[in-house]
Amino acid sequence: MIEIFAHRAIFNGIENSAKSIPYYKKLGIGIELDLRYNNNQVYISHDPTNNGDFFEEVCKQYDKSSIKLALHIKENEALNPTIKILEKYSIKNYFLFNTENFEYSNLVDKTKIADYVVKQDQNIKAKILWCDELQNKWYSEKIVKNLHKRKKLIYVMSLEVLEKCDEKSVYLEWERLINLGVDGICTKYPEKLIKFVKGDLN
């Protein structure tokens, strides 16, 4: 069964909100969150602002849940405090990625690091891959099979996360990604993707 991640834990039209956690715990799918650091606090926000919910509030509500957390570290300063919060609440089902290629500290379990992959010939070291085709279309059945032979987990960004598109284009993209055999999809429409995977979407 393909894994599903809610992009920025979107809930009732609001992104990166701690209020989404009970909903996605009940739904049983993963969430992707953007993490930043300011005033000695890790907070969730795509943009640099002090108005985001604290990441610790997310972890308090997580409470022994099994849903997977995809944590986008937006600033290097957020890294070590994030690890300490995860350890404080004994959260194990997560991975970290960043798009700036900064180095991870020794506090980070190397098995929890995902490589951010944007092209076919990129040097890949991690077991977990967080991928997109923003620059060009590079996914293929051959590439996915080869990565799986190397024991890689392939998580990809859905089309509507990367660009404006209509619903039909999103559904066609989901079909392509599923047929390619990727392990998970991050989407703005997690409920619809659940139905799509089950064949229940009219």
Where in the sequence are the language-model features?
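Phosphate-group recognition and catalysis centered on beta-loop-alpha active-site segments
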Residues: 1-202
